[in-house]
Amino acid sequence: MSVADDISDDALVQRFPGEAITHDNAAHYRGRLRRELLLNRCADCGRWHAPPKPICPDCWSSAVSAEPVRGDGVIFMAILLHRGPPAPGVDYSTPYPVVTVELDEQSGLRFTSTVVGADNDDIRIGAAVRLDWADRAGAPIPVFALKEPRA
């Protein structure tokens, strides 16, 4: 058992200030402490879904649990923010990329974050990405990196 599994709910909320941690998503934040991206999967129909919900939106089963995903996929949508709410580690002096990635685990399974280690000109729809991690305010957050940056 890891430290992430032993952490109390109150301590979990303190590790991720400003995040809305609930009964339905606490396992996902514990996974982040292990640098593991967890998304809900239904035990009855096998479908993945995000964001976390207590009931499968496909078959209405309550047999859902947080399971790890690899985090490989393609950029489905990309925008550059020039302004936004204050957030640890976010610098709006240069446009800040926000992407929605369609994950390889299932068609239509999407996760939104940012891309790190790439020029904004290289962040484009259809680009292949892999899961990476960044530390923000002392807590790990899932981000994406381009698999093959443009030459």
Predicted regions and their residues:
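Short metal-coordination and nucleic-acid-contact micro-motifs, chiefly zinc-binding Cys/His arrays
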Residues: R35-L38, P52, V69-G71
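Conserved hydrophobic positions within beta-strands
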Residues: G73-F76, V115
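A broadly conserved sequence feature marking short terminus-proximal activation segments
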Residues: M1-L37, Q106, L146-K147
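Cys/His-coordinated zinc-binding microdomains
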Residues: G46, W60
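Well-ordered alpha/beta subsegment
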Residues: Q106, F111-A151
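OB-fold (S1/OB) nucleic-acid-binding surfaces
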Residues: D91-L109
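Cys/His-enriched microdomains
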Residues: N40-A43, P54, R124
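Short functional micro-motifs and their immediate structural scaffolds
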Residues: A50, A63-S65
